Amino acid sequence: MADIFDLFRKISKESASAAPISHIIVGLGNPGIRYQWTRHNAGFLAMDAITAKYGGNPERAKFNALVGETTIAGKRVLLMKPQTFMNHSGDAVEAAMSFYKLTPAQLLVISDDISLDVGKLRVRKSGSAGGQKGLNSIIESLGTQDFARIRVGVGQKPSPDYDLADWVLSVFSPEQREHLQKNSFPYVVAGVEKILAGDLDGAMQHCNGKGGI
């Protein structure tokens, strides 16, 4: 009997793997080891937390991005880390969405947010880029603001005259990295699950304001 159940599970897994891509999740960041732990790479780091649970680590080069595939909440998902550098992220996202013939309603973007304390989350259905260059590039490429996003707080500049580029390209402290892993990214993963299950309002209720130091 156990063999029969194992066979059903194998068939189910293979069927899910063969299903067409129905959603794209994009983690925003900059490519290269020098940027790995920077604030601007919070989207890449959150993506790593997703793949730690679901697999599909983005390793294959396509669409000017590293991509992988997995299944979350019964949906076949393309996971993307654009390799265009932040300001041109929209080029990679638009190419993937065009290839799979998806709409903005099937897109979820995870990015950093300097207006939020480190780790604090904000889920939104749509809206402006709020000064985030990667989000702005995606909005310009798609011609719409109407796509879901999860914003991960990376902290405000230490002072008003502190250079913004220097701030977002500064690295998280070891304590901040540990906090993100333990207290913030689990909420990100749960939010992704709810959004892909069609419960974006539930994701907002579950995640917004959570995860901060």
Residue ranges with predicted function:
Residues 160-178:
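Short, electropositive alpha-helical surface patch
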Residues 129:
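Conserved TIR/SEFIR loop-to-helix hotspot centered on a Trp-containing motif
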